[in-house]
Amino acid sequence: MHGLLLAAGLLSLPLRVLAHPQPSTSLTSQGVDLNAYRMADRSSYMSSDEMKLEQPSISSLSGGNYVETATEVVKRMMPGVTFRMVDDHYVGESGISHVYFRQTMHGMDIDNSDFNVNIGKDGKVLSFGNSFYTNPTPDKAPVEKRDFSDPMKALHGARKALNLPINADKATIKSMNEHEVMFMGTSGALSDPQGKLCYMAKEDGTLALTWRVETDMGDNWLLSYVDAKDTDKVHNVVDYVSHATYQVYPWPVPDPTEGKRAVLQNPWNLKASPFTWISDGKNNYSTTRGNNAIAQANFDGGSDYLNNYRPNNKNLKFEYPYAPNMSPPKSYIDASVTQLFYSANMVHDLYYMLGFTEKAGNFQVNNRNQGGKGGDFVILNAQDGSGTNNANFATPPDGQPGRMRVYIWTKAKPARDSSFEAGTVIHEYTHGLSNRLCGGPANSACLNGMESGGMGEGWGDFFATAIRLKPNDNRNANYVHGEWVNNSPRGNRMFPYSTSLQTNPLVYTSCNKYNEVHAIGTVWCSILYEVLWNLIDKHGKNDGPTPVFENGVPKDGKYLAMKLVLDGMAIQPCKPTFVQARNAILDADMNLTKGANKCELWKAFAKRGLGTGAKYDPKNRTGSKAVPKECQ
């Protein structure tokens, strides 16, 4: 065998599984704190304003196609560094071109070293993000020196360190290519584990050769970076799980306490779902399956979703009884699956209109030759038996299905099914949105740092909250996340989302005392809630289920805020900080409206301590209430 025993290319890029409205930082059921293995947030981001001052030669670059321009940026900024372009570049709905690069060393990836370039509608460089490694590098390739362990030892190392219930006693190694392997004959994981030899830039500024061991455990889908020499040492871990007629609680009804069920006819948006929700363009279905999603019961928590039960009606009447006092949950499983299918498809259609399209890496089986990789609807598991009091979403790279698991919550009697809390479904689906947009559709490992992971939680809460706004709401409206499933008026966040600093005192520097992504996410959503109301106060609020555009810009403040936040996800660097994400939102507004909302945005950020003087340090963030002179 030449070189190494190794496994499956870009396909093995990790998937992000995000669990949550209920805070959980442990490897499910194994008692391992994954926070201890999070990657450091080490990206830099140069905004359009900063680039004009500090890199005018880059700012003025243009000519050729956007890929050539982006490649030239990387060459000029990182001379002598080897890299490859990731095959997921695209032109977004706002006219910004996004190109992604991965640093290489001796023909292998440095797996957490990325560079993203954003090209504006005028063909000039808008901004870029960078986490390339610049310290001393090894002289010789490890393949030449054979300076690494057998990959099987790495699998055992990951299993031991993370207490994974994987049996590999009879496992064999199948070589996929020079640097990647698949572990055959294991049990305990939902699919065959994979291994990839790659470098990892460590927090101390050195480079480690690692085996990246990928294991899908269901509620956790892990990429474990095991030291290639000392396989008892795990450097970092990425977790991908972060987590007709339809009788449903229609949007924006958030839960059974705030509205009544209704029978909706053909609720899809044909621009976003031209095959409707129950066809993929090749096959028509009479069940909860289509181009965007497939929904079913999953009582045993297993992975055989295709053969699981789902409601079926040849007349396409998905109308089933449900009331909050019904018990046990299985007695209303048809209504649960239908509600989950409805909510997830509504999210798909809305996000599509805001820019999460095929080429941006959305979740669809059939991409209609519109770009991106198809074959990846969202698997929706209702009443999932693998846990309680939670929900999660697994986000693999584009072309592999996302997976949402929603559980029964036992904090009330009778127990409550989180399919019926729209905020839970929106929050989880938004993990898929943010992980596909940040760093590009082929890289699902960009939100695994503490601050970036916190923003992943905050974005989920932000979109869930914005969608549930009521017609009579004004900036004095307060919203609690997860109150129904938790059976608590406090929900599952520290404070309500509010524009009042008395009701919600969280500011940027509050993050200094938190070491948990949901707490940090609450701070981020609190900041975005200020953005939301500043833009609504300026542009009004569209209470309809879809935005109305004028020249590509939402006409109202609610959907404009959602659009700018979504565009910012695609612009920001891999593993962003609050400061970098703030700058990306400002750049998104500069691109979309020529900066018409600059002062509204700055005032919102500054109110919560993310003004012009804010600085990131993981242990000692500096807050600022300053705004640019023109906004004073």
Curated annotation (Swiss-Prot):
Cellular component terms (Gene Ontology): extracellular region
GO MF: metalloendopeptidase activity; zinc ion binding
The EC class name is hydrolase
Query: Keyword Coiled coil, does the record have it?
Result: no
What Gene3D superfamilies does the database record attribute to this sequence? 3.10.170.10, Neutral Protease Domain 2 (1.10.390.10)
- The active site is formed by 428
Glycosylation (residues): 284, 591, 620
S-S pairs: none
Q: Which residues form the signal peptide?
A: 1-19
What cofactors are annotated for this protein? Zn(2+)
Give a short account of what the protein does: Secreted metalloproteinase that allows assimilation of proteinaceous substrates and probably acts as a virulence factor.
> What protein name is recorded for this chain?
Extracellular metalloproteinase 1
